[in-house]
C-alpha cells in the first residue's frame, strides 16, 4: 500500500495547513523583496540566524521555543542592518553586501554550533532541512482545540504580514520604486524598509525549524517571481503570489506522497517537493505568462514579423505596379528583393491570397482592390515619414528609406494626418515619387 492510500486527513491536513501558512506568509513579503531586487535577503537571513540560534542554545542550555525565537529574530534583524550598513558605508551593491554578511554570520554560527554541541542537544539537520512531516505531533490547546504549535505561530505571522501589506501597501509600493519620493511625501521610507526586514526575519525564523531553509527561501522568492511574470499590477501580483504559494504547498505534499512510488521509493521530503512544485510553477509562468512568458513573447514576435513581412510584400507590389503595371512577380522575384526566407515568403503570399489581398495566376501575383487599398496606406505612411525625416529631422534623402520602412508599419490614420499637417508639401516624397492620397471613409 502506498501513495494516496496512506492519506490521513488529520496528519496530512495539518502538514498542508502548515505549508500553506509558511508559503503565503513568505510570499506576501517576498513580493516587495523581488521588487526591491533583494530576493536573496530571505536566503541570507535563513543562513545568518544560525549564530542567533546557537547563542540562544548556549545561554539557555535548552531548545525551548522562546529563546530560540528571540535569538534567531535578533540575528535576522542584525543581518538586514549589517547589509544596509555595508552597502552604504562600503559603497557596494546590495548583493555583495548580503554575500559578506550572511557568509560571515553563517560561518560564525557553524563555529558556535560546534562549540555548543557537547552541551546542547542541537541538530543542524533540523535547522537546514526542517521536519514539516512532524507538525501534527507537537500540539497546544487553544480555546479547547488541539492544534499544532507551528500552525498557531504561523497563523499569527500570516495575520501580521497580511495586515502590514494591507495597511501600508501605498507606502510599500512607493518606497519600493522610489524611496526618495516616498520620504518627500511625508513618511520615512527607511522605517518602512526596516519594518519589512524585521517581518522577513520573523517570518523566516517562525518557519525555520518546521519547514527548513529550502522551503522558506523558495517561498520568499519563487511565487512572487512567478506572479511577476504573469502581471504588471502590484495588487494582482500579491494575490497571485499567495495563490501560487498555496498551490505549491498543496501539490507539493501530495507529490511527496505519490511521485516517489512511481520510481519504487516510499516517500520524499515534503518541504523539498513544495519547493520543487513552486519551481515548476515558475517555469510554467516564465514560459507561458501572458506578457513576459518566453513562448508568448516568441509567438508575439513571430506574429509581428509576419505582419511586417506581409506589409512589405503588399507595399512592394504597389511600387512594382507603379513602375510597371504589366509585371506580375513570382515568389523568387519577391524574395530576392525582400531578402526573406523562401518558406516565409511563400506562406505569407498564400495568406494574402487567401484573404483576397493578392491574386495568384500560375505563381505570378498581383494586387486585388482590397490589397491595393492596404498597400496605398502603407506607401503613403512611408513617404510621409520620408518627407518628415528630411524636413524636421534634418536627414538626407539618401538615408531615410530604412527608417521610414520600419515606421510605416506602426503608423495609423491619425498619425498620418498629423504627419500630413506637419509637412509643407505632401504631394511628393523627397525622391519625387507621388504620395498616395488618404483612403476616404464614409
Where are these regions (language model features)?
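Short loop segments and helix-boundary regions at transmembrane helix junctions
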Residues: 31-122, 227-242, 246, 254-268
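Transmembrane helix-bundle core of multi-pass membrane transporters
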Residues: 106-163
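Membrane-interfacial segments at transmembrane helix termini in multi-pass membrane proteins
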Residues: 274-319, 413-436
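Structured cytosolic domains appended to multi-pass membrane proteins
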Residues: 323-442
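Helix-loop-helix "hairpin" substructures at the membrane interface of multi-pass membrane proteins
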Residues: 146-218
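Membrane-interfacial amphipathic/re-entrant helices at transmembrane-helix boundaries
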Residues: 1-24
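Hydrophobic alpha-helical segments embedded in the membrane of multi-pass proteins
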Residues: 24, 47-48, 103-104, 191-202, ...
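Hydrophobic alpha-helical transmembrane segments
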Residues: 16-21, 69-74, 96-100, 151-156, ...
Amino acid at each position: 500500500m502506498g501513495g494516496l492510500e496512506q492519506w490521513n486527513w488529520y496528519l496530512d491536513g495539518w502538514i498542508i495547513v502548515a505549508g500553506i501558512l509558511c508559503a503565503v506568509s513568505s510570499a506576501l513579503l517576498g513580493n516587495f523583496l523581488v521588487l526591491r531586487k533583494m530576493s536573496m535577503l530571505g536566503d541570507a537571513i535563513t543562513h545568518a540566524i544560525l549564530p542567533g540560534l546557537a547563542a540562544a542554545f548556549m545561554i539557555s542550555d535548552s531548545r525551548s521555543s522562546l529563546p530560540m525565537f528571540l535569538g534567531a529574530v535578533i540575528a535576522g534583524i542584525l543581518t538586514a542592518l549589517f547589509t544596509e550598513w555595508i552597502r552604504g558605508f562600503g559603497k557596494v551593491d546590495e548583493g555583495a553586501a548580503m554575500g559578506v554578511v550572511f557568509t560571515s554570520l553563517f560561518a560564525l554560527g557553524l563555529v558556535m554550533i560546534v562549540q555548543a554541541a557537547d552541551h546542547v542537544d542541537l541538530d543542524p539537520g533540523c535547522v537546514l532541512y526542517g521536519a514539516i512531516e512532524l507538525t501534527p505531533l507537537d500540539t497546544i490547546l487553544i480555546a479547547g482545540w488541539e492544534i499544532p504549535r507551528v500552525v498557531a505561530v504561523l497563523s499569527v505571522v500570516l495575520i501580521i504580514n497580511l495586515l502590514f501589506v494591507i495597511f501600508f501597501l501605498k507606502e510599500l509600493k512607493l518606497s519600493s520604486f522610489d524611496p526618495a519620493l516616498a520620504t518627500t511625501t511625508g513618511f520615512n521610507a527607511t522605517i518602512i524598509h526596516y519594518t519589512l526586514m524585521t517581518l522577513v526575519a520573523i517570518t523566516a525564523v517562525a518557519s525555520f525549524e518546521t519547514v527548513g531553509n529550502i522551503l522558506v527561501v523558495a517561498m520568499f522568492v519563487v511565487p512572487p517571481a512567478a506572479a511577476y511574470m504573469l502581471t504588471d499590477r502590484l495588487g494582482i501580483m500579491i494575490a497571485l503570489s499567495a495563490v501560487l504559494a498555496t498551490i505549491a504547498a498543496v501539490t507539493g505534499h501530495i507529490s511527496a506522497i505519490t511521485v516517489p512510488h512511481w520510481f519504487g521509493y516510499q516517500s520524499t521530503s515534503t518541504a523539498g517537493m513544495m519547493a520543487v512544485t513552486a519551481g515548476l510553477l515558475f517555469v510554467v509562468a516564465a514560459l507561458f505568462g501572458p506578457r513576459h512568458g518566453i513562448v508568448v513573447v516568441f509567438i508575439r514576435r513571430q506574429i509581428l514579423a509576419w505582419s511586417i513581412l506581409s506589409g512589405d510584400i503588399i507595399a512592394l507590389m504597389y511600387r512594382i505596379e507603379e513602375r510597371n503595371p504589366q509585371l506580375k512577380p513570382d515568389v523568387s522575384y519577391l524574395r530576392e528583393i525582400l531578402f526573406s526566407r523562401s518558406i516565409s515568403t511563400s506562406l505569407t503570399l498564400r495568406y494574402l491570397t487567401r484573404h483576397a489581398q493578392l491574386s495568384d495566376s500560375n505563381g505570378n501575383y498581383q494586387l486585388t482592390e482590397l490589397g491595393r487599398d492596404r498597400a496605398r496606406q502603407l506607401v503613403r505612411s512611408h513617404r510621409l515619414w520620408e518627407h518628415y525625416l528630411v524636413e524636421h529631422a534634418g536627414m538626407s534623402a539618401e538615408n531615410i528609406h530604412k527608417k521610414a520602412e520600419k515606421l510605416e508599419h506602426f503608423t495609423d490614420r491619425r498619425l498620418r494626418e498629423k504627419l500630413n499637417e506637419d509637412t509643407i508639401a505632401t504631394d511628393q516624397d523627397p525622391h519625387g515619387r507621388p504620395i498616395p492620397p488618404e483612403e476616404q471613409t464614409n
